[in-house]
């Protein structure tokens, strides 16, 4: 059965739940330590957040039980009308385009997200000390934690996404696969290391240095590309201090400055299905868009996808034409912030409009509807998160970027092993071009 996509204004979509926490709401009481609503919803389908009351062992057992659950129900093209109020336009479009193969398994909701207590202590301090620029495009000051647990603007929500807890220093072992409608798969194996200086607890002031985020990507395979690398020094004040980047060229065995990668710059490893500011779903400057904080809404979103931690995203059993197998997915009902970004008239970007859905418990963007210059839904992004005890916290196990017009999709996923989370900063100089060159020569 074909299902047509109904274009629904965002303000109508927010009728399910559209509220911003009042300033009087207290962190750790009505709100969780990161600013989510602690209470469940009226019908009990979203439970109260209580992950802070569990020991590490009890939380681990909880996660193990989750992996053994069966779906409460499965949404198909045949019963879609019953559930469409909980779905993003991108998901509705997937049903319209692929009614025979696409479905959504919906499981019980578990609010498993939590993070170290010391980050909670700093988040409370950020209520007084965190600051953004007048334009909202730069983060000027914050202690190690979410800057804005009670956001009043869309920019504050997006800065929360960009600075959310992901550990201090991370080494990720990933597979990246472009999947075409004929199931031709083009894959890369990479190691990505990132360091967020924001979470350095030795800082004596909330004021932020211009260089604050460090990123290095190293290609392991295939053989024709192995050895190449990309180093980025990024900024939380990107208008004053734009990012710097270098590439490592295997044949030359040296680092070379490269044009800054940002906004809608193409990324070679995704065949144009993902642009530079879509790394981590969204990253970098906010200045090319006008931002609107629409409110909060209950939605069905990918969540607690523990099994994806151990599945390669080039596994043929998980791949179908146009999308991954629904059997690999887990959706739950959660509350999200809804943020709309519209391209400014005097700015350039291939995406005219984007709607971001941000999980209230983690501040991670989990879904994105992306529109072209004609305001047609063009692309759709999903983040499948899992809980990582080593972090500890929620982190992406798979990001899926769909081109709804040509049918191809790009996946970035955990390799299942080799990913490490560190609670302390890397050695001094670890992310300098000289250090990278020395390590790559070994």
What are the language-model segments listed below?
Residues 171-221, 279-356, 366-368:
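Extended beta-strand-rich segments in extracellular/periplasmic secretory proteins, especially
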Residues 27-243, 249:
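Solvent-exposed N-terminal domain segments of exported/luminal and surface proteins
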Residues 417-442:
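Long, C-terminal catalytic modules of enzymes
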Residues 9-19:
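Bacterial N-terminal signal peptides
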Residues 28-52, 66, 75, 88, ...:
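Gly/Pro-enriched, hydrophobic low-complexity segments
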Residues 20-24:
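Sec/Tat signal peptide C-region and signal peptidase I cleavage site
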Residues 2-10:
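Bacterial N-terminal signal peptides that target proteins for export
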Residues 4, 16-18, 28:
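Residue-level detector of alpha-helical hydrophobic segments embedded in or interacting with membranes
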């Amino acid at each position: 059965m074909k299902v047509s996509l109904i274009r629904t204004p965002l303000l109508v979509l927010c009728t399910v739940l559209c509220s911003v926490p009042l300033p009087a709401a207290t962190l750790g009481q009505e709100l969780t330590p990161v600013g989510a609503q602690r209470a469940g919803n009226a019908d009990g389908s979203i439970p109260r957040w209580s992950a802070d009351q569990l020991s590490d062992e009890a939380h681990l057992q909880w996660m193990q039980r989750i992996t053994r659950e069966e779906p409460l129900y499965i949404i198909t093209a045949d019963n879609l009308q019953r559930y469409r109020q909980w779905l993003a336009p991108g998901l509705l479009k997937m049903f319209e385009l692929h009614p025979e193969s696409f479905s959504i398994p919906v499981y019980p909701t578990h609010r498993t997200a939590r993070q170290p207590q010391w980050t909670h202590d700093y988040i409370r301090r950020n209520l007084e000390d965190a600051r953004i620029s007048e334009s909202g495009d730069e983060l000027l000051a914050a202690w190690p934690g979410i800057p804005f647990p009670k956001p009043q603007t869309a920019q504050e929500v997006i800065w929360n996404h960009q600075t959310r807890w992901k550990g201090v220093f991370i080494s990720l072992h990933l597979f990246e696969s472009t999947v075409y409608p004929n199931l031709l798969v083009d894959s890369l194996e990479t190691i990505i290391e990132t360091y967020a200086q924001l979470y350095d607890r030795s800082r004596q002031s909330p004021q932020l240095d211009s260089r604050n985020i460090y990123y290095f990507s190293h290609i392991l395979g295939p053989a024709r590309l192995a050895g190449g690398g990309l180093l980025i020094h990024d900024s939380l004040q990107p208008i004053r201090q734009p990012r710097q980047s270098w590439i490592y060229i295997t044949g030359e065995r040296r680092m070379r400055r490269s044009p800054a990668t940002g906004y809608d710059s193409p990324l070679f490893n995704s065949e144009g299905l993902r642009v530079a500011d879509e790394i981590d779903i969204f990253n970098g400057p906010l200045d090319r868009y006008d931002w609107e904080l629409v409110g909060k809404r209950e939605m069905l979103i990918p969540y607690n996808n523990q099994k994806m931690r151990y599945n390669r995203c080039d596994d043929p059993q998980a791949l179908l034409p146009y999308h991954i197998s629904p059997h690999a997915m887990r959706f739950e009902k959660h509350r999200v912030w809804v943020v709309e970004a519209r391209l400014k008239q005097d700015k350039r970007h291939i995406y005219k409009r984007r709607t971001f859905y941000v999980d209230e418990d983690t501040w991670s963007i989990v879904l994105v509807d992306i529109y072209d210059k004609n305001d047609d839904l063009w692309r759709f992004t999903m983040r499948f998160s899992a809980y990582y005890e080593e972090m500890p916290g929620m982190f992406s196990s798979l990001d899926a970027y769909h081109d709804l017009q040509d049918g191809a999709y790009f996946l970035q996923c955990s390799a299942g092993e080799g990913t490490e989370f560190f609670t302390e900063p890397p050695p001094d100089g670890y992310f300098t071009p000289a250090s990278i060159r020395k390590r790559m020569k070994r």
